[in-house]
Each structure stands twice: as structure tokens, then as C-alpha cells.
Amino acid sequence: VSESGAAQVRWCLVVPVKKLAMAKSRLAGPRMDAATRARLALAFAGDAVSAALAAGPVVEAVVVTDDPLVGSALGELGATVVPDRPDAGLNPALAFGAEVAREKFGDVGVVAMAADLPALLTSELDFALGAVSGYQRHFIADAQDVGTSMLFAPPGVELDPR
């Protein structure tokens, strides 16, 4: 319950993470080999999940991945790790993670969050979660305004990633 007496929405984040061997492929080149890209992707995901788990209204982070190293590292941070059972791309992984979150926690809000947000601050996520209102989805576009960094579905609203 907030200071105003209103019930605070509880949120569960869903974070899909590719297999590290496929991560950050756009950075491939002579100065960035596969091992370096994998370490970078894992560090990005770890930073993002750590910041998310420290946010006040966040009750859980569900990481959807088939990579055992990702699962181990993010599980050690406190995330729930589930296999990418759909194995059909980003949107099915997000929908599956949202289903897992609501099965475990009931009527929570769900946030689909990109794993590559290493500069995410807990205070920024707290602010964004507090700004979501009503019964509709909200989103935060990526820096290039061509994708989505976060997609918010309040309690009772389907995540419906597209």
C-alpha cells in the first residue's frame, strides 16, 4: 500500500536472452570476436536484471533463455530462469515468460524488458513503473525509435508482444 493508501501494483519482468553464441551479432568484426560479444551480452543482461530486481514494486524477473551460462549467471542474481520452450523467436518467448509470471504470481503487471540495458538505473525503472496507469499497455521505445526497450502490461492486461 502506498502513502496515499492505494494498493501498489506488483510487477514481474520478463527478460528474453539469446544464446550467447548468437548475441550481439551486429558488433561482429575484427575487433569484436564471438567470445567478447558473449561476455558483453552477459554483462549487459546481468546489469539490467540486477537493476530491475532492486526496483521497489518488482517481485520477480523471469529470464527466458536456452543458454546454460546465462541461466546460471542470472539465476545467481535472483532471477527465475525458464527454458525458451516456444523456441520461436522474441515475441513467443515474451508471451511464454508472461504466462509463467502470472501463473506464479497471479494478477501482477508484466514488463517485457530488453536484456541489453546496461545503463538502466533502478530509480528510472521505479519511475517508469509508477507512471503506468489505467488498463492499457505502455511502452518505452529504444534510442533509435525503431524498437521497444520495455513493454508494460498492467494487471489484467495481456502483454501481447508484436
Protein language model regions, located:
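N-terminal nucleotide-binding beta1-loop-alpha1 segment
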Residues: 1-28
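Short glycine-enriched, charge-decorated loop/helix-capping segments at active-site entrances
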Residues: 27-36
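A short, N-terminal amphipathic alpha-helix
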Residues: 41-58
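Acidic donor-binding segment of Leloir-type glycosyltransferases
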Residues: 56-80
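Short phosphate-binding loop-to-helix
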Residues: 73-109
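The conserved acidic donor/metal-binding loop of glycosyltransferases
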Residues: 114-118
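Conserved donor-nucleotide/metal-binding helix-loop-beta segment in metal-dependent transferases, i.e.
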Residues: 119-145
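Short, glycine-/small-residue-rich phosphate/pyrophosphate-handling segment
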Residues: 152-162
